Amino acid sequence: MAFSPKESMASRRQALGLSALGLTSAFGLVACGSSADNASSSASATPSEKPKYAGKVSVVPENEATEHNPTHPATVTGEEGTTLKSVKLVNDTTGAELKGTLSDDKITWTSSEDLEFDTQYTLTYTAIDSQKVEGKGESTFGTVTAANQADAWIPNVQEGGVYGVAQILEFHFSEPVVNKDAIEKLISVTGKGVGEGKIRWYSDTVARWRTEDYLPARTAITAKANILGVDLGNGMIGNSNLVVNFSTSDKRYALADNNTKTMQMFVNDKLVNTVPITLGNEDWPSVVGKLVVIEQEATYKFDPTTLGLKKGDPHWYEPFTAHNTSRLTNSGVFVHQALPSAYAYVGVGNVSHGCLGMMPADAQYFFDTFDVGDIVETVNTGYPMADPDNGYGDWNIPFASYSDENYKGDW
């Protein structure tokens, strides 16, 4: 049977359509068959694991460290190819984040802001190992507590004070100083014309400083003890630097001579007054040597019991209030106005218990002219010197022997 052209075209389209469908299906089956094979292959293989962080980081202070010296920075350091991405150091008390610096090679981070004493800190970091895998870490530590801190101060010199040129600088420490040589290097006294000084230790907590000659007159002076963060010994850490600024007055010197029963007063090496005095009696002779005015009071109550005297003792005297007093020793040697009962002996004989007594006008003159830190030297009493720590008898020690704690003078 023959086909018409119209039918023939339609039949061809149908045949081509079926043929195309068959090809598509065939490709589809092939594709489906290939996917199935891959799925089966993947199912039978071991799945790949995510790389683990293998970096190495060292932290100072170590985790949970205590009594860390706050003057020493906290550091984080990457090792064996590990670098640092970020570091954060936080004060646990205030929540404040401390500043720090990351090295250019990103290996080391160092805190650049001062830590505080007796404070807990938390340090966190993100690091990257040699395989570029990130990891995180955390460390906590505490700084030196109050029980292990040490202070320094100068009790006999106040900030902004004015003192005589013979003033001794006495450094006190709240804890025993074991590392004396190291601490001495941290003590300085500076000012125009101030000479080289030496230090003498009177105990593990008290050290005095002086020069060979007196301090220069009318000079601004700064005394320091830079002990912040320094171990004084036994793990006691200095918690601050000591700085005291003061100045000196005119050079004032007094010479009390038992032979003449007089006191000569000098200001800037010029004699300004000579006055009669009474000194200590035979049983209580005045000590000789150079002593420094420790303190001054317009009035001061004298009590014989402080000398170990009791009523009935031949040296007993009734307590009295002295005027225009300048203390020279801790044990009770003063320059002061004599009692009316002693006026007749001033310039003639000795009736005191070691003090230097004057007539009222002369005592007033001394009190108004002299000040703390000025020098008073007594001679020709036939009695030894006062111990150097009974007041400030340091000027009686030869400068060459001043640092020798075993040196024993005439006291």
Question: Model-predicted segments: where are they?
Answer:
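Acidic, low-complexity Ser/Thr/Gly/Pro-rich repeat segments typical of extracellular/periplasmic
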Residues: 2-20, 28, 33-250, 277
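Conserved beta-strand and immediately adjacent loop positions that scaffold enzyme active sites
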Residues: 86, 186, 262, 325, ...
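Exported/periplasmic cell-wall-interacting domains
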Residues: 165, 288, 304-411
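Extracytoplasmic/secreted envelope proteins and their assembly/folding machinery
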Residues: 170, 184, 260, 274, ...
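Structured segments of extracytoplasmic/periplasmic soluble domains
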Residues: 172, 176, 180, 299, ...
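Short, glycine/acidic-rich beta->alpha junctions
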Residues: 203, 207, 255-258, 285, ...
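Gly/Pro-biased beta-strand-loop elements
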Residues: 236-344
